[in-house]
A protein has these predicted regions:
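N-terminal, polar/charged subdomain of small-to-medium soluble alpha/beta proteins
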Residues: 1-77
Length: 77
């Protein structure tokens, strides 16, 4: 699992998502996910949407994932 694989999974699952994923070791990842689909969602709900897109990979291939989830408007602020 690498940053690109995670990006593809998130973009495929969350409509209109713009995703940037980085990692120094392909085990610990940091993701910025921007989506209009996060509108009116709590932080927990947003993170759950991302975790759901990664499925069982969160239990096996991804040791840690730091998330920053934003709507397009929040990203401009």
């Amino acid at each position: 699992m690498n940053s690109y694989d995670i990006k593809v999974l998130i973009e495929a699952s969350i409509e209109d998502a713009v995703v940037n994923v980085s990692s120094d070791d392909n085990v610990h990842f940091e993701a910025i996910v921007i989506s209009q689909g996060f509108q009116e969602k709590s932080l927990v709900q947003r993170h759950q949407m991302v975790y759901d897109s990664l499925g069982d990979k969160m239990q096996s291939e991804i040791h840690a994932l730091s998330l920053n989830t934003l709507t397009p408007k929040e990203n401009l602020e």
